[in-house]
């Protein structure tokens, strides 16, 4: 496995062993990334909820201003006429796209959050599978060990000469 020791028992069957500390570290990293995406999605939905509440307050303020202006223009004994029906319909039509937008944003925010988790785990699984099948850790370790030996040989001889002269 890419994160630890891997061994192929049978051809085509990969058995990997991961140390618990590395597994915990990896899972906590994936959990934190997912939590960050969840916070972003929740923040967006909160923003849209606040925007919807503010638009509702603005509409109720407009209605209050409209009724107060109508009542101040009419004599005190007369009943104020009902608000214009076309104005109310246009306000309702303005609210419909907002509510649809909020639902759409919440849906896609949750969808993005869950697809991120699933995609992350699938990619991690494929990475570990291919790393164990092609013995990537062993080849990387062999390469590093060979390079370290190449570097260490001259240093070893220099150290031996230095010790011999002293």
Curated annotation (Swiss-Prot):
InterPro entries: Herpes_UL5. GO terms for cellular component: host cell cytoplasm. Its main location: host cell. The keyword Glycosyltransferase does not apply. It is found in: Host cytoplasm. Keywords: Host cytoplasm, Host-virus interaction. Interacts with host IQGAP1. May play a role in rearrangement of cellular cytoskeleton towards an efficient viral assembly and spreading. This is Protein UL5. It comes from Human cytomegalovirus (strain Merlin). The gene is UL5.
């Amino acid at each position: 496995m890419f994160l630890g020791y891997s061994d192929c028992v049978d051809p085509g069957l990969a058995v990997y062993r991961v140390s618990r500390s590395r597994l915990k570290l990896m899972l906590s990293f994936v959990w934190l990334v997912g939590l960050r995406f969840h916070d972003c999605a929740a923040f967006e939905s909160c923003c849209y909820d606040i925007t919807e509440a503010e638009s509702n307050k603005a509409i109720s303020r407009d209605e209050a201003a409209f009724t107060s202006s109508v009542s101040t223009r009419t004599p005190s004994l007369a009943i104020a006429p009902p608000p214009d029906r076309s104005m109310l319909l246009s306000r309702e039509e303005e609210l419909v796209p907002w509510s649809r937008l909020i639902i759409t944003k919440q849906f896609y925010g949750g969808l993005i959050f869950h697809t991120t988790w699933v995609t992350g785990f699938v990619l991690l699984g494929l990475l570990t599978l291919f790393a164990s099948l092609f013995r990537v850790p062993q080849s990387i370790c062999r390469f590093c060990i060979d390079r370290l030996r190449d570097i260490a040989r001259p240093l070893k001889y220099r150290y031996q000469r230095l010790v011999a002269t002293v």
